């Protein structure tokens, strides 16, 4: 492999797709051989020389390991940079992209561990993807909500409620001041609550809350199903009801299904909320798997208006910077290389719409100053237990979140330092809102 696929003198082309792999070779295996093997097994190579190699232009189609750098503080671990010619990949297909780059190479026996840390998608390939159904700006225009983060809540308990009681919980949260409520990712169409009943009860709650508050409201109706035809049926029913948004579990559902649903949502005026159920199976190990920044990039290409991205509150500073790095990759039009934030390559999105990050998991009103400072306005903050756990009920819990959010945004706009004064801002808001 090394003689053919390790090319340290290679000059990267503007149209190459670049990958950064964290690579741990087996003891005794040279890093150059492993890097070349990764390039070979994820492009044109196989375990032996075959006579049909002579029937193709191998230099045109092969992947190349063009750089290796040791990982600081780790023994026998390297970042291998691999360049792939754009002609290896089908236009507009995240499925084909990932099948080629990570489909087989992770089982290669010369490697102890392998992790895909980042991808550089060139403009020539980015332009073959539709991206999010609508994007952040169109979503704000449809909701008529500007200048603050959007607020949401996952309805709990996530399993076991009847459709009628589920709709009641949705109504109380929306009436209290939230912009969205959410189906849990586990909720599809079980015996205790079939999807059509849930869609009907939740849409009734949306319209009732809208009429009382004068605001556009939404509920993430989970359209995930066992086959794409059934997903289309559920999304079509949501469109008939006139609700603004549906939801998909994109990793368990698959990228092909996600892209299909995204295109349907674009054509039928639905926003698409994406949950990342199963992501930790792929991205939790530091030395093996795929980093979430790659899953976030590929989701933006496949299509999604929202994507769960973690909270960063309470984590180490380094983790915070890495999380904010892939949050920027989700929503910004152009992101510069910045290794301190885990961004290995400069990424130009060529005008593709942004995906709004969703912060959820263990957050409540006292986190609001930090969340406002970290995420800014273009984010959706999801308070599950932080809403439904309020001692006075769902609507007061929602009101508490809304008041805290607006107080923090106003304080920030007035130039106050939320990192120092955030607690005071929340306590001042308590005087005007007993919730």
UniProtKB/Swiss-Prot annotation:
For the site Transition state stabilizer, which positions are given? Answer: 315
Q: What protein name does the entry list?
A: Ribulose bisphosphate carboxylase large chain
Cofactor mode of binding and number, as noted: Binds 1 Mg(2+) ion per subunit.
What's one GO BP annotation on this UniProt entry?
reductive pentose-phosphate cycle
Q: Which cofactor does it need?
A: Mg(2+)
State the Gene Ontology terms under molecular function.
magnesium ion binding; monooxygenase activity; ribulose-bisphosphate carboxylase activity
- Binding annotation for substrate: 104, 154, 158, 276, 308, 360
**PTM-bearing positions, type N6-carboxylysine:** 182
EC no. given is 4.1.1.39
Q: Which reaction does it catalyse?
A: 2 (2R)-3-phosphoglycerate + 2 H(+) = D-ribulose 1,5-bisphosphate + CO2 + H2O; D-ribulose 1,5-bisphosphate + O2 = 2-phosphoglycolate + (2R)-3-phosphoglycerate + 2 H(+)
**Subunit annotation:** Heterohexadecamer of 8 large chains and 8 small chains.
PROSITE patterns, sorted: RUBISCO_LARGE
Q: Which GO terms describe its cellular component?
A: chloroplast
* Family statement: Belongs to the RuBisCO large chain family. Type I subfamily.
Species of origin = Euglena pisciformis
- What is an example of a Pfam family matching this protein? RuBisCO_large
Q: Which domain of life is it from?
A: Eukaryota
């Amino acid at each position: 492999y090394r003689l053919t696929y390790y090319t340290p003198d290679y000059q990267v082309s503007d149209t190459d797709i670049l990958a950064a792999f964290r690579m741990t070779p087996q003891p005794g295996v040279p890093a150059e051989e492993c890097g070349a093997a990764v390039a070979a097994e994820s492009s044109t190579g196989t375990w032996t020389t075959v006579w049909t190699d002579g029937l193709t232009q191998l230099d045109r189609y092969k992947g190349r390991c063009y750089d290796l750098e040791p990982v600081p503080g780790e023994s026998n671990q390297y970042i291998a940079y691999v360049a792939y010619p754009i002609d290896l990949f089908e236009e507009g297909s995240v499925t084909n992209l990932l099948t080629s780059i990570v489909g087989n190479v992770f089982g290669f026996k010369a490697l102890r561990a392998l992790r895909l840390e980042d991808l550089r998608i060139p403009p020539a390939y980015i332009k073959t993807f539709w991206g999010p159904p609508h994007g952040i700006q169109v979503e704000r225009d449809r909701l008529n909500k500007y200048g603050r983060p959007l607020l949401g809540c996952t309805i709990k308990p996530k399993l076991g409620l009847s459709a009628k009681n589920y709709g009641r919980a949705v109504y109380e949260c929306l009436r209290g001041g939230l912009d969205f409520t959410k189906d849990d990712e586990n909720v599809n169409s079980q015996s205790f609550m079939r999807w059509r009943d849930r869609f009907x009860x939740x849409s009734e709650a949306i319209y009732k809350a809208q009429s009382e508050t004068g605001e556009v409201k939404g509920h993430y109706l989970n359209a995930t199903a066992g086959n794409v035809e059934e997903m289309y049926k559920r999304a079509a029913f949501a469109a008939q009801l006139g609700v603004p948004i549906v939801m998909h579990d994109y990793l368990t559902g698959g990228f092909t299904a996600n892209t299909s649903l995204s295109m349907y949502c674009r054509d039928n005026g639905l926003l698409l909320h994406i949950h990342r159920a199963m992501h930790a199976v792929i991205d939790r190990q530091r030395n093996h798997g795929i980093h979430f920044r790659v899953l976030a990039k590929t989701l933006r290409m496949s299509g999604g208006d929202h994507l769960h991205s973690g909270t960063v509150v309470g984590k180490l500073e380094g983790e915070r910077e890495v999380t904010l790095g892939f949050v920027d990759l989700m929503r910004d039009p152009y992101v510069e290389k910045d290794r301190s934030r885990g961004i290995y390559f400069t990424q130009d999105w060529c005008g593709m719409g942004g995906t709004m990050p969703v912060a959820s998991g263990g957050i409540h009103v006292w986190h609001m100053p930090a969340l406002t400072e970290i995420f800014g306005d273009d984010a959706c903050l999801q308070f599950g237990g932080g809403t439904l756990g309020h001692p006075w009920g769902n609507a007061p819990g929602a009101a508490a979140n809304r008041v805290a959010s607006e107080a923090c945004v106003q304080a920030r706009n007035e130039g106050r330092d939320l990192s120092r004064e955030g607690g005071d801002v929340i306590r001042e808001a308590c005087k005007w809102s007993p919730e």
